[in-house]
């Protein structure tokens, strides 16, 4: 019973489908409860956790909050003093600290502001601080940042900040703290850390999860009601370094057994195990794994398996419906933790970068709030087969759940450790028979805090966040607990955020963004597999024999035709030429399948690289069309010192020779050719000898879009023959070249021997690309970027990483992680979607690499 993503719709349609959620009576009850909770909690402001106070003062809406978060993240893992000192100086110089000093009643917040915590106590304040000159003192501190006491003080302060997010450095320490603190009597433990980058990482995380399950079971004593005990949350990305839809086969073969082993262990110990939600492009695969776990006969009679669902995902209602149907079909209870969502910023940016039709998440927070309520109603209706777990720090959300909850339905609330404590304490104090509250409790060394810290701040540090406004007395209670359905109704038709354009409109009026593919959907991948099959229609054209190479006489004839057509083409309106390019971009996207097959089968591109190259070619067409209109649309009027009219007009130079490489046989070929054409020039283009079909197909597309055939000739032929003929032709007006440095030098020398005016040579050649890494960089991000840069396109691009320079203190760790990540790469057939690294372009190229190694 696989989950099938619903058809993509516009965001407004998805939002309207959620409504209505609350009845009038439920809405009134939710508002009354929320109002009472906020009022009661504000009366106890001095009891709030440090972290709530910190987030109210230092959100992500001011430079000082960002500076402190950078320090909190990086100082905990920078091993060397010099780098730490430089970071401290940079971040302390970045903010207006006077605006925060003394403003909060929390000692913790002011200590963080001044950076004066040292071994658990405050040092004496200097005189200028007592007089209120915090900014002046901090500027002086910046200049003295090499002093060990300053470094120690700030490291201590940052550890305290980190400790507010983390319940213990290991599971043993966490369990001791839970026994000591009543607010942690019921927890779901999360082992901190980035997703695995190596198989060794994955094995280490699996061992950590298993050890934690055993430790929790020992600490909890004999098994009872699974929902009355501590539970554990696991991230699938921590258990396999290649957890993605493109690696589905590997994931099911390697990740699934590992998760099954943990689920069986948790079931045997009577503990709940929850699969954490991650990025939306992993949603379908994660649900496939959850279904396999539910069907496992070894755990069938043991409740406790659960997963998190992110309400900001526009597929969340369909996911809830699928899970309920699955639980009923299998007669297997399932716990569902309903959260708002933790990756909103990256989901939006990723959709923009990938050119997706829309966003996988709602663009307005109020829409997420309504979706959370709509999903909550579905879960409550499915209880007790589904055990709802509502994760919220929102007083209105608590009130709405209590208003919707049928009498006697088992459920629980959840909160993040360090946040929401006062809100739930007030709820337990003032509301009879309040449901259990579980703390989501991260466990791990402070150095592993980054990913968790950033997600929590993005969730809770924004101006619109309930946590940010909850205790702010300047914000009216009615505004804090406002009903999201009412807020949504006030938006009218503007249900999608007007400040977040669709990915296609990312560049505004200038041009349209190129269209990509959502590779997280199995239906998309099935279509792509069909396109790339060697016996498919698209591949057949890619594998057809290429035409015979042109000869020098063909070059002469092409230049003659180009020179003859120059006047008519260049004197036409720039709008007409730009429109040709825009039609070509549209046609390229409409015929994407054929070009993907050509790139994979002729150039050896992997599917991901091929998609990116088609998009880049379309972007070139639209970008140069927009630039030509800007530069040539009207003359630029210049000053006339003696009353005369002076204007500057950009015109075509003549006929250009465009020589493109095999490593980007579509994108670079297209960029060279369309830039010359749209400005009124004519072109004789020589594509790479190994990839002629791609260039010829794009040339045909340009002709169909309106470029005269005589204005563009595409001549596959031997490079030296073309160069010797073209560079000697009297009609030549310039050369555009991308390729080796040696060939670029030869072209430069050949042009220098010509009589007459000096012709322009626009040359892009090779080089050594380096990445320089210091100890402030997160190792996982370094490895991700290094692997992508060095081995994308099999390393066959001029921008590929060639030299990685690492600071001594972190070199060994990064090298070990890099080696492990490289070991997980799949080298093979580029038509296989699981392939990461395809073949190099020729046998000679492969032999050269082997010789170099």
Predicted regions and their residues:
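Positively charged, amphipathic and often flexible ligand-engagement surfaces
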Residues: 1-513
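Catalytic cores of nucleotide-enabled group-transfer and carboxylate-activating enzymes in metabolic
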Residues: 156-176, 180-187, 197, 212, ...
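Periplasmic-binding protein-like
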Residues: 391, 674, 734-738
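Terminal low-complexity tails and localization/encapsulation signals of metabolic enzymes
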Residues: 432-434, 443-587, 597-598, 612-626, ...
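Residue-level signal for inorganic ion chemistry
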Residues: 562, 577, 599, 621, ...
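Conserved small-residue-rich beta-alpha loop and adjacent elements
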Residues: 634-709, 766, 780
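A structured beta-alpha segment of the ubiquitous adenosine-cofactor-binding alpha/beta core
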Residues: 645-647, 713-736
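ALDH superfamily catalytic-core signature
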Residues: 701-707, 728-729, 734, 742-853
């Amino acid at each position: 019973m696989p989950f099938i993503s619903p058809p993509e719709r516009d965001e407004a349609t998805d939002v309207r489908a959620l409504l209505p959620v609350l009845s009038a009576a439920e809405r009134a009850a939710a508002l009354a409860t929320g109002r009472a909770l906020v009022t009661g909690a504000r009366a106890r402001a001095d009891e709030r956790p440090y972290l709530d106070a910190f987030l109210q003062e230092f959100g992500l809406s001011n430079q000082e909050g960002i500076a402190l978060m950078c320090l909190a993240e990086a100082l905990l893992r920078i091993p060397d003093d010099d780098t730490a000192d430089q970071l401290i100086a940079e971040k302390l110089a970045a903010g207006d600290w006077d605006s925060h000093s003394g403003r909060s009643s929390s000692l913790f917040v002011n200590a963080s502001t001044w950076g004066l915590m040292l071994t658990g106590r405050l040092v004496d304040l200097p005189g200028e601080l007592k007089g209120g000159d915090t900014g002046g003192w901090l500027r002086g501190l910046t200049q003295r940042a090499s002093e060990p006491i300053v470094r120690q003080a700030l490291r201590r302060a940052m550890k305290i900040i980190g400790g507010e997010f983390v319940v213990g450095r290991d599971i043993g320490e966490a369990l001791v703290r839970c026994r000591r603190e009543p607010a942690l009597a019921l927890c779901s433990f999360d082992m901190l850390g980035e997703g695995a980058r190596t198989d060794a990482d994955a094995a280490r995380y699996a061992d950590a999860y298993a050890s934690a399950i055993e430790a929790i079971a020992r600490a909890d004593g004999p098994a009872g009601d699974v929902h009355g005990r501590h539970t554990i949350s696991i991230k699938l990305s921590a258990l396999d370094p290649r957890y993605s839809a493109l690696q589905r086969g590997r994931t099911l073969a390697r990740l699934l057994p590992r998760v099954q082993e943990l689920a069986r262990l948790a079931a045997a110990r009577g503990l709940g195990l929850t699969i954490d939600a991650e990025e939306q492009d992993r949603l379908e695969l994660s649900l496939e794994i959850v279904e396999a776990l539910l069907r496992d006969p070894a755990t069938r009679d043991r409740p406790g398996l659960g997963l998190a669902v992110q309400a900001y995902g526009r597929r969340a209602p369909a996911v809830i419906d699928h899970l309920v149907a699955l639980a009923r079909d299998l007669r297997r209870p399932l716990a569902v933790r309903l959260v708002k969502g933790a990756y909103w910023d990256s989901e939006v940016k990723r959709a923009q970068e990938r050119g997706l039709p829309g966003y996988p998440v709602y663009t307005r927070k109020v829409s997420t709030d309504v979706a959370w309520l709509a999903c909550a109603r579905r879960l409550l209706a499915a209880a007790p087969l589904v055990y709802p777990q509502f994760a919220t720090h929102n007083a209105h959300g608590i009130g709405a759940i209590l208003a919707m909850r049928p009498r006697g339905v088992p459920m629980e609330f959840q909160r993040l450790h360090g946040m929401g404590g006062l809100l739930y304490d007030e709820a337990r104090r003032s509301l009879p028979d309040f449901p259990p509250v579980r703390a989501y409790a991260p466990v791990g060394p402070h150095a592993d805090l980054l990913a968790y810290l950033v997600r929590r701040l993005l969730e809770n540090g924004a101006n619109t966040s309930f946590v940010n406004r909850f205790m702010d007395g300047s914000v009216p209670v009615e505004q804090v607990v406002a009903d999201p359905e009412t807020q949504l109704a006030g938006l009218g038709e503007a249900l999608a955020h007007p400040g977040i354009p669709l990915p296609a409109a990312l560049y505004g009026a200038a041009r349209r963004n190129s269209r990509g593919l959502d590779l997280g959907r199995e239906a998309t991948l099935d279509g792509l597999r069909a396109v790339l099959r060697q016996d498919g229609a698209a591949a057949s054209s890619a594998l057809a024999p290429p035409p015979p190479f042109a000869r020098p006489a063909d070059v002469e004839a092409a230049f003659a035709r180009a020179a003859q057509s120059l006047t008519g083409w260049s004197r036409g309106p720039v709008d007409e030429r730009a429109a040709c390019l825009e039609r070509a971009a549209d046609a390229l996207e409409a015929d994407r399948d054929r070009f993907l097959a050509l790139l994979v089968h002729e150039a050896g591109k992997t599917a991901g690289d091929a998609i990116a190259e088609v998009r880049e070619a379309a972007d070139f067409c639209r970008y140069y069309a927009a630039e030509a209109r800007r530069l040539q649309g009207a003359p630029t009027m210049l000053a006339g010192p003696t009353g005369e009219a002076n204007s500057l007009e950009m015109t075509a130079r003549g006929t250009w020779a465009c020589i493109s490489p095999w490593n980007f046989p579509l994108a670079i070929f297209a960029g060279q050719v369309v830039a010359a054409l749209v400005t009124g020039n004519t072109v004789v283009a020589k594509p790479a000898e190994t990839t002629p079909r791609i260039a010829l197909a794009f040339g045909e597309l340009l002709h169909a879009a309106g470029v005269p055939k005589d204005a563009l000739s595409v001549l596959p032929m031997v490079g030296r023959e073309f160069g010797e003929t073209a560079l000697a032709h009297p009609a030549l007006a310039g050369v555009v070249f991308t390729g080796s440095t040696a060939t670029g030098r030869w072209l430069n020398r050949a042009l220098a021997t010509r009589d007459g005016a000096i012709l322009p040579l626009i040359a892009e050649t090779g080089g050594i690309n380096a990445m320089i890494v210091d100890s402030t960089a997160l190792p996982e991000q370094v490895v991700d970027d290094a692997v992508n840069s060095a081995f994308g396109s099999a390393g066959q691009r001029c921008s590929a990483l060639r030299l990685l320079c690492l600071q001594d203190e972190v070199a060994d760790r990064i090298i070990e992680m890099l080696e492990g990540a490289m070991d997980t790469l799949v080298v093979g057939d580029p038509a296989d979607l699981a392939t990461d690294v395809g073949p190099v372009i020729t046998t000679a190229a492969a032999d050269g690499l082997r010789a170099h190694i």
